Amino acid sequence: MSSTDRPVVRRDFTEKTHATSYPFISPLAQDLSGRRVLITGAAWEDGVGYATATAFARAGASAIAVMDLRGISDDLVSQLKAAAIEAGRPECQVVSGRVDISQWESVAAFKETVSEAFGHRLDVLVNNAAHQEPYSSILDADPDVYWKTWEVNVHGLFNMTRAFLPMLIDTRAKHDGLGIMINVASSGALSVRKGGASYRTSKLAVLRWTEALNLEHGGDGLLAFCVNPGAIKTHLTINEPEEVRNMLPHKPEIAGDTIAWLAAKRREWMGGRYISCPWDMEEVLGRKDEIVEGDKLKLNMHF
């Protein structure tokens, strides 16, 4: 294997990492009662969006909106309500919809649905929906499929922010809301390999865009940052080579439970940064001063 074929392997920030959930981030230890959350890309039971919605239900979120391009099944809605009850929480309100985040009209219509159902309040927005093109070289790629990755991952993120950021800010100001936006990026943004360039570069754009968003609207009450969900075999990875998919070590719960844990409490110093869900969160908290003083976990180019 040549150096151009080999993925760049980067050291994890924490000494300890996790492939699945662990007690420190357990949703059962969080209290999100009274909170209203929205998660995109939540239709697949083996996916990060569904795991995240389940974690919020188990953490006691009062209302959860879930959306996906393929729609949300009635079974999934029932399972979310059951997850809350099984965790000893009140049954959560669940709002679901079929939404194409790359289309403004689709997003705007669902925004009205959520606003009415949630009493014009929203505490947490998790932008998880994504598209990944089949692995191929740039010249061999289908241009429409290749560019769809950017339409969903970048344009879709812009549409969701344009629609729901005012609700996050308003809830923060009037109802002591959390005002948290978590954008799901990827460790792929930090490395390069043959194939999948559209996905990797779109997630790289998400990192910088989120940093800019937090800078522009942090003073309005927004706290925005990115997470890497981990290397998880989900429906999103179906276009990756099967030998690559079979080596992915993480479970959806490491992403879902970490995201719910991150959303349960505002930590202003995380604004604009990149957090990898498999990292040990107790260690991340213990290294806060190092991260802030060194302005770490942000994009930088050294000369």
Where are these regions (language model features)?
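Conserved glycine-rich Rossmann-like NAD(P)H-binding loop of the short-chain dehydrogenase/reductase
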Residues: 61-77
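Amphipathic alpha-helical dimer-interface segment in Rossmann-like NAD(P)H-dependent oxidoreductases
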Residues: 112-116, 152-176, 214-215
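Catalytic Tyr-X3-Lys loop
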Residues: 123, 131, 139-158, 181-182, ...
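Catalytic loop of short-chain dehydrogenase/reductase
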Residues: 169-219, 231-232
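C-terminal helical subdomain
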Residues: 10-21, 226, 243-303
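Canonical Rossmann dinucleotide-binding motif of NAD(H)/NADP(H)-dependent dehydrogenases/reductases
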Residues: 25-65
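Conserved mid-core segment of classical short-chain dehydrogenase/reductases
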Residues: 108, 115, 132-147, 166, ...
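The beta1-alpha1 cofactor-binding region of Rossmann-like NAD(H)/NADP(H)-dependent oxidoreductases
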Residues: 74, 97-110, 143
